[in-house]
């Protein structure tokens, strides 16, 4: 394919990036009660809630944040009383993160928002199309992670 025949808007990576940005715009966690959290904080809360206990490095990786973004989100969530840090026994420099009781309540709201957002995104797809889409996205992710 030459540059003359290239169509940026039909490029898979361009489409996926645009879709990710559109999803982020729909990820409004600011109305959550009893606290307001950012999109990054919402992802961190969801990752910890789903996995139960993780290190800061694991959280950043699973939430697709760089280490500094992950650390800022963790500090903010600790300050808001939504997650707690416990020093790891095997490494005094490392901490395990888990949800507090208040964090578990907010996590339930975050999950409800994620499910609602997924329902909106997939509403015109049949169950078979939804499964096919997820399978294809998983294959693409595998290709990129292993290349």
Language model: regions and residue ranges:
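Residues within helix-turn-helix
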Residues: 56-57, 68, 75, 95
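N-terminal leader segment of winged-helix/HTH proteins
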Residues: 1-35, 82
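The alpha-helix within a helix-turn-helix
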Residues: 60
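C-terminal regulatory/oligomerization modules of transcriptional regulators
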Residues: 1-5, 128-147
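Charged, amphipathic alpha-helical coiled-coil/dimerization segments
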Residues: 24, 30, 75-138
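Short capping segments at the starts of secondary-structure elements
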Residues: 51-55
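Short alpha-helical "packing" element that flanks the helix-turn-helix/winged-helix DNA-binding module
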Residues: 44-45
